[in-house]
A protein has these predicted regions:
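Inter-motif core of Ras-like GTPase G domains
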Residues: 88-113, 129-136
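Conserved G1/Walker A P-loop phosphate-binding module
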Residues: 1-87, 91, 95-102
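Generic enzyme active-site microenvironment
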Residues: 73, 106, 144
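C-terminal-of-GTPase-core extension/linker across diverse P-loop GTPases
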Residues: 3-4, 10-33, 39, 67, ...
Length: 210
């Protein structure tokens, strides 16, 4: 240009950005409950899977494709007691749960032979949700009793079913290893997501391959 002015002094700001994943469904539970294996079983994701806690240190995303639906599923790293106080990086993980519409609470049936301890897995995560953001308790839930192939005590299965009926939360038993219950879980996810659509004007999510 033939004419230019010096202009005004610019502004400088330092910003701290907080990342929160947006997903239709979030898989939550204690460490080593089998969430990553379930994600692999129901979606196109291929997360790292190991036989020890805290294998997943950041959320994994997968796309569950059913007919013309594309449902984004997030595998949230395991939550422990004190997560709401940032134990085990809990606050970092809980932030991602806030942006999900439906929560799937995965219980590890192989972790103990005690029904009370399995129920305690449910209570721990619920308590941390309540301490962090009570609105999380109002989300639609599906409870998954995972690793059913390793459960020998039928009384635990019956007792957990009775307990979840009292809680008025749908329960399904699955095995990511053998495939038991996986089709049923997918059906429950599709139905629940359909009943709780995204708010109008929200971001449209598409498969990375589209």
């Amino acid at each position: 240009p033939r004419f230019a002015e010096k202009g005004e002094e610019g502004q400088e700001k330092k910003l701290v950005l907080e990342l929160k994943l947006i997903a239709d469904v979030g898989l939550v539970g204690i460490p080593n409950a089998g969430k990553s294996s379930l994600l692999k079983a129901i979606s196109n994701a291929n997360p790292r899977i190991e036989g020890y806690p805290f294998t997943t240190l950041s959320p994994n995303l997968g796309i569950l494709a059913v007919d013309d639906q594309r449902i984004v599923v997030a595998d949230v790293p395991g939550l422990i007691e004190g997560a709401s106080e940032n134990k085990g990086l809990g606050i970092y993980f809980l932030r991602h749960v806030e942006r999900t519409r439906v929560l799937i609470h995965v219980l590890d049936l192989a972790a103990t032979n005690s029904l009370d301890q399995i129920i305690r897995q449910w209570e721990i995560v619920r308590e941390e949700f309540a301490a962090y953001n009570e609105n999380l308790l109002e989300r639609p839930y599906i409870v998954v009793g995972n690793k059913i192939d390793l459960l020998d005590d039928e009384a635990i299965r019956v007792g957990l079913s009775d307990y979840m009926k009292i809680q008025q939360v749908p329960l399904i038993f699955t095995s990511a290893l053998t495939g038991e219950g996986i089709d049923g879980l997918i059906g429950m996810i599709v139905d629940t997501v359909r009943d709780y659509p995204r708010p109008q004007g929200s971001t449209k999510l598409v498969s990375p391959t589209q």
